[in-house]
UniProtKB/Swiss-Prot annotation:
Single GO term (MF): ATP binding
Job description of the protein: Reversibly transfers an adenylyl group from ATP to 4'-phosphopantetheine, yielding dephospho-CoA (dPCoA) and pyrophosphate.
EC assignment: 2.7.7.3
Catalyzed reactions: (R)-4'-phosphopantetheine + ATP + H(+) = 3'-dephospho-CoA + diphosphate
Spans traversing the lipid bilayer: none
Any one GO CC term of the record: cytoplasm
Record carries keyword Magnesium: yes
Lineage: Bacteria, Bacillati, Bacillota, Clostridia, Eubacteriales
Xref: SUPFAM superfamilies: Nucleotidylyl transferase
NCBIfam families: coaD_prev_kdtB, cyt_tran_rel
Organism name: Clostridium kluyveri (strain ATCC 8527 / DSM 555 / NBRC 12016 / NCIMB 10680 / K1)
Protein name as it appears in the record: Phosphopantetheine adenylyltransferase
Gene transcribed to yield this protein: coaD
Gene Ontology process terms (BP): coenzyme A biosynthetic process
Length: 164
């Protein structure tokens, strides 16, 4: 059975993330969305909230599980008995960073491989940071994030929401 890990902060999950999850779930028997706990970073959502939001969004994809982890990704992968990392790429700049991370992971564990999936053209500009910025100023985030999480994001900001 092939099992892959799609790691990230997902703060918040975007339609770009969901696209990668959906496509990767068709390539691997099991996909674990690994939600990174970063104690040094104050996120918009707690790790528990992020896990719950993602679970809500992927509930109809039967071979996708969502779990949080802290520490090294390699350690989480060993615990989950996975040897494949899935990463989404939007631009060349993403590739440069992710290539370095892939090489580091390979150095830490030679059995680990990284599979890069290109973002769909309609999501190539999308990031969690840009979604937060738009939402912070009351802009429309419909089409940027799954419908199931729009209200949760809006509630985090004390702004009037503009419908599209």
């Amino acid at each position: 059975m092939s099992r892959a890990i799609y790691p990230g902060s997902f703060d918040p999950i975007t339609n770009g993330h969901l696209d990668i999850i959906d496509r990767a779930s068709k390539v691997f028997d099991e996909l674990i969305v690994g939600v990174l706990v970063n104690p040094d970073k104050k996120g918009l959502f707690t790790v528990e909230e992020r896990v719950e939001l993602i679970e809500r969004v992927v509930k109809d994809i039967p071979n996708v599980k969502v779990e949080s982890f802290s520490g090294l990704l390699i350690d989480f992968m060993k615990k989950k008995q996975s040897q494949v990392i899935v990463k989404g790429l939007r631009a060349v700049s993403d590739f440069e960073y992710e290539c370095q991370m892939s090489l580091m992971n390979k150095k830490l564990d030679p059995n680990i491989d990284t599979v890069f999936m290109m973002a769909s053209a309609m999501n190539s500009f999308l990031s969690s940071s840009s979604v937060k910025q738009v939402a912070m100023f009351g802009g429309c985030i419909e089409g940027l994030v799954p419908e199931e999480v729009i209200i949760d994001i809006i509630k985090k900001f004390d702004k009037a929401y503009k419908n599209c």
